[in-house]
């Protein structure tokens, strides 16, 4: 029985030795270096020594870090413990689940109270700045955009005073250590500075500055021997990273709580972070509400000159782009106008070319046909003279008279074409030979001349024309135009043709309506253009010649699609002659 007890004690002793060996090691404590590396090591080295003594076999080292170095060290795991203010503890805890072991209660280093944190807004006593609103337009220095005592608390105080830190005054961040910011204020590099509470008094005790040269803005009453512009919060929290075992964390916590009375630092239970977190939310720096734009904003504040240069360059490029686009738009409109004018000139040249070709063709036809027509008339008239001398009732006399009349009509047609060509070439219109023409007789004559009853027996003519209605025109001009339009309608398949003529306020109007189905709108716009036709056997000259002849008679002609009286689709041709179109009496009238 005694042997078994001895063996059990030996096993427990071995386990204890193994556990102690497992706990033994070297541990790094990352500490926020508010006043630089040398000052931080000197101030906190007694803590590392006390922990090493309280925990045999464990060695603790001090590692001074600024805000950004602290974040990087936690992310990379190069430190196992951290000592920092509650605000940074909240920030770090969002990236790694830290365990808050203790909060600092008091120190025995002979300096001003160092277990609280706040901000004091300092300015030189001889600067003339006595209120927060005197900072408008001035340069205010701070340690870092994320520094709790070195910026955020002062930022909140100035905002509560009605100032807009980013707009009402310029911010300049100097980084750690905070001593440099006080020196810059002393040398007038900045007009005010946001520094941690008690920094001024500690530097004064060390003989680095004279605190009487400075005053505090937004000063608040406090039982501490330090100036402050903000409420005070618990400072310096001791936390362990997740990599630290629970056993070691417990041993360190006991060592902190059970420090000897002569120790430099005395710790207690962790203080609440609720007030700190509420303030971080007020200044929009809480990790649970941070947004990318806040980081961008902080970066922009720290790089104002570079950002200003980039913005200026961007504005110059934008103005240059706008100017170039205005020039392009202006040149584009000018090119469009020039293009329209060019197309108009091209159409005018094309029309002139077509008219020139048409004029040459007309002149050629008139020249070539005039002599045969004259010979036909001479032969017909000679035959008439001989036959009348032999027999007044000879049966060939009516036929010869028709030959003579039709030859004369052909000659008149050629003469009208030659007059039109002469007008197109700029010669004046000769109206002495014009005469009053009965419109109803001209329609009947054309109908008989075209032999419509024999050639197109399915076409029915409907006329509403007064027998007394006359128009003063060159000989056979109206018949030429009517013949072309009537023939076009019949060849297009019309079964009914309506012709209405009436006197209007300023002339004579003749309207011809068919039911041949109408004309395509695209072709309708080019109906009077020479050489435009919808029939394979057509030359595209009929309507073009009609338009020129009507204009030669000082009138106008138009064409459009319109439903016929029988309900079928069709085309309407309207011819209008003015009263002043030229007769020697200067009038187209219904009486002739």
Curated annotation (Swiss-Prot):
This is Tetrathionate sensor histidine kinase TtrS. Disruption phenotype: Mutants are defective in tetrathionate respiration. Its main location: membrane. It is found in: Cell inner membrane. Member of the two-component regulatory system TtrR/TtrS, which is required for synthesis of tetrathionate reductase. Probably functions as a sensor protein kinase which is autophosphorylated at a histidine residue in response to tetrathionate, and transfers its phosphate group to TtrR. During mice infection, the ability to use tetrathionate as an electron acceptor is a growth advantage for S.typhimurium over the competing microbiota in the lumen of the inflamed gut. Residues 364-581 form the Histidine kinase domain. NCBIfam families: tetrathio_HK. It is a multi-pass membrane protein. It is an enzyme of class 2 (transferase). Coiled coil: none annotated. GO terms for molecular function: ATP binding; phosphorelay sensor kinase activity. Its EC number is 2.7.13.3. CDD domains: HisKA (cd00082).
